[in-house]
């Protein structure tokens, strides 16, 4: 049945994704709602809320404000809040209410800029899409507004040694330590400085607010770690000539050591991490086999509940919409190994039971044919990898 959820909780909407991108940048983030959407962001969709400050506000829309289109009241609230806080910009994030009444975000942004005397960006999310759509809009708007185009392009020597990392959010990586790990990876493996836009820079490199975004044209290459950041990477390539690579550099920690040769495998995650896990498994299969002339690779399918970019997909990759889609896929394809969020474990078990096949829940019970391996995705379960490890300990 369309839209019926018996196993999975609702996924984070687009406004949550937009907030996730902007959360650490030192701006005043106003969610244009009556209060409920902001409560969901703070309570469920943004794990940094419990340990890291951000100026995140609800517009506190009342019924008559929405019906009569009293945008001036929102402007007054923003002016008052901005005057009491040390913020560098204001971001207005859309929700279903302004979408229904047809709010003109560009006009609202101009009204605010005149009063605030600081940059104002608006993200026209409507609460009807998933988190990655909001992230994609926020990444694009961020660099369109703040990346300094007036500066002359630096020559390659001045750019050498700096790598930008696009797409890092807790929703996508499920790991609050991912920025630190990625910086260490590029420093140790390539001797280069990784600039993790929008996540982990305040603590890791003591760089605050929009400093990195303004100098986005001063890196030699961008690394794209989620499909939501691909459009921004293309924009930066067009604007500054900065090439990009789509990968997840610390993927090795997501793939446990076991024999994958000849296995039929399903990976369910966001598309870039799923692709990186597939490439890592293939690399390990080839390394174990040792003979490139012998094809002992696993047969691997990547699937996702979220955006699947055609240019990043292989033949047979799948975009999931309903729980029944997933269960039917597992029943029909009879995978040896499934990588997915733990929230999907019971659903996978039930799919195998319906098919009348055996099942092994432990990733290390390699004697059994069918194996489920935890691949935590915060956007699916609202759990971080650190949380899942603590539960297992």
Annotate each predicted stretch with a short phrase.
Residues 1-393:
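An N-terminal assembly and electron-transfer interface module characteristic of large anaerobic redox
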């Amino acid at each position: 049945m369309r839209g019926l959820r018996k196993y999975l909780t609702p996924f984070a909407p687009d406004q949550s994704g937009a907030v996730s991108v902007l959360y650490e940048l030192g701006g005043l983030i106003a969610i244009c709602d009556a209060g409920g959407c902001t409560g969901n962001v703070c309570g469920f969709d943004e794990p940094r809320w419990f340990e890291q400050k951000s100026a995140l506000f609800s517009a506190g829309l009342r019924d008559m404000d929405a019906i009569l289109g009293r945008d001036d009241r929102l402007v007054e609230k923003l002016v008052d809040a901005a005057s009491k806080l040390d913020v560098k910009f204001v971001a207005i994030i859309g929700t279903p209410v302004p979408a229904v009444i047809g709010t003109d975000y560009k006009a609202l942004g101009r009204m605010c800029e005149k009063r605030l005397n600081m940059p104002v960006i608006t993200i026209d999310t409507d609460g009807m899409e998933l988190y990655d759509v909001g992230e994609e809009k926020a990444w694009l708007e961020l660099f369109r507004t703040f990346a300094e185009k007036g500066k002359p392009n630096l020559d390659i020597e001045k750019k050498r040694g700096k790598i930008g990392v696009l797409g890092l959010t807790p929703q996508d990586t499920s790991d609050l330590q991912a920025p630190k790990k990625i910086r260490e990876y590029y420093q140790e493996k390539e001797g280069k400085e990784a600039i993790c836009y929008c996540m982990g820079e305040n603590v890791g490199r003591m760089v605050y607010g929009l400093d990195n975004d303004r100098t986005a044209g001063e890196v030699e290459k961008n690394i794209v770690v989620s499909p939501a950041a691909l459009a921004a990477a293309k924009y930066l390539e067009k604007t500054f000539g900065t090439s990009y690579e789509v990968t997840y550099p610390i993927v090795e920690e997501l793939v446990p050591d076991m024999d994958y040769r000849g296995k039929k495998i399903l990976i369910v995650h966001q598309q870039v991490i799923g692709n990186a896990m597939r490439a890592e498994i293939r690399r390990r299969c080839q390394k174990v086999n040792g003979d490139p002339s012998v094809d002992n690779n696993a047969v691997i399918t990547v699937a996702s509940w979220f955006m699947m970019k055609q240019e990043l997909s292989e033949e047979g990759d799948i975009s999931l919409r309903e729980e029944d889609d997933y269960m039917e896929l597992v029943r029909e394809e009879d995978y040896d190994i499934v990588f997915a969020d733990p929230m999907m474990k019971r659903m996978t078990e039930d799919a195998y039971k319906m098919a009348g096949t055996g099942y092994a829940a432990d990733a290390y019970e390699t004697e059994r044919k069918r194996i489920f391996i935890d691949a935590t995705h915060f956007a699916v379960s609202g759990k971080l990898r650190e949380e899942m490890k603590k539960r297992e300990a």
